Each structure stands twice: as C-alpha cells, then as structure tokens.
Amino acid sequence: SNRSPSLRLRF
C-alpha cells in the first residue's frame, strides 16, 4: 500500500 513508484517495486 505504497504510493511511491520506487517502493512500489518491492511493496
């Protein structure tokens, strides 16, 4: 449930 595009790769 992350809005960050970078963290979205993991989460």
Swiss-Prot record:
The modification Phenylalanine amide is found at F11. Its main location: secreted. Both forms widely expressed in the nervous system. Expressed in corpora cardiaca, corpora allata, hypocerebral ganglion, frontal ganglion, frontal connectives, recurrent nerve, esophageal nerves, protocerebrum, pars intercerebralis, antennal lobe, tritocerebrum, circumesophageal connectives, subesophageal ganglion, thoracic ganglia and abdominal ganglia. Not detected in abdominal perisympathetic organs (at protein level). Keywords: Amidation, Neuropeptide, Secreted. GO terms for biological process: neuropeptide signaling pathway. One of its GO terms (cellular component) is extracellular region. It is found in: Secreted. Belongs to the NPY family. This is Short neuropeptide F. It comes from Locusta migratoria (Migratory locust).
